[in-house]
């Protein structure tokens, strides 16, 4: 009797929860390492005597490496497993994060940020493959929503931590410090993770049985799906629909994320510490909404686009109100409203991606979608830097660009059929074979 009670207590915490938590930490440190530069940027620009366009290129060059290696990184995870690829990648980018603090040359800093982006490019495909391996299909939307909270917490923590460290020790120290935790985390993943849930020493029969339904579905469709290749995936309209949705969405997201601190300092006249705090607020609000987006998309599975579309549109309207506000208090309010609905839409979107792509090419397929976002991440900060410089320091045109882009993302989402998961997925109810 006591043994049975102990077994029940132990079974409440599942291996997949640990996997998700560690994946969450990986995403968190990836965002911390890439986002501290947005707070440090005015000081880097002053130290290295950079124009707004040069600062924009410094923000964008990360995404050049990130986009370039996104698909190859996903393919590596499909071939070698997410454990090895993720552990090596996080150690790689953490080393180059710390090296950033030792650079005194602008060209060399561009090179470091580019190589840093190559390492981070391996994470998305590996992380989504890990979720596909360990989570039953009915929980993947929630899992991706929880994982995506780092899209909000990362910039929030980075803003506050970077402002505090820069204020006390200067901008170089923040990069040196941020690189250390990732190395430790990478070693943990290498020694403690398994690609196949069946190989994990703490995996229970009870938890494996929850995956059996997905496994059996995959076996029943094995013959039909055996010929599915990554090349054939490129012929699927749904891949390109999702890729273009994510491209336009990320034009807005990375413009909002990259230039918000500079906007608050240069246009609204806030201090460094106030900028850190107010830059963090939208992402703290978004932490709630991104989980809510994943949860709601699970509730309307098969019609996930109807969670994405209205929230993307509302976010664009909030950005318009933010642009038109003369009061700093209202600017802060509207930026929080914009972030809430932006991240709610984001949580719903990745539930659709994970549920739609064939399991055996999950990492490569999701990396392709994310690659388009990376291309947007390269274009957006650089273009906005040029627009700011060309307009004599005005941010008006950048807001118009962000509003237009997120509305276009919603319009593209309208072209997806209501039963997309059922009609387009080759095996949407499967988990990955390790």
Question: Could you tell me what each predicted segment is?
Answer:
Residues 37-38, 231-291, 346, 350, ...:
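Extracytoplasmic gate region of multi-pass secondary transporters
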Residues 49, 81, 96, 102-108, ...:
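Helix-breaking motifs and short loop linkers at transmembrane-helix boundaries and internal kinks
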Residues 68-107:
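Conserved MFS/SLC helix-loop-helix module at the cytosolic interface between two early adjacent transmembrane helices
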Residues 70-81, 290-302, 388:
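Helix-to-loop junctions at the C-terminal end of transmembrane segments
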Residues 79-90, 298-312:
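Cytoplasmic membrane-interface "Motif A"-like loop-to-helix N-cap segments
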Residues 112-152:
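Cytoplasmic helix-loop-helix junction between adjacent transmembrane helices
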Residues 147-200:
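Helix-loop-helix hairpin linking two adjacent transmembrane segments in secondary transporters
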Residues 302-352:
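C-terminal transmembrane helical hairpin of 12-TM major facilitator-type secondary transporters
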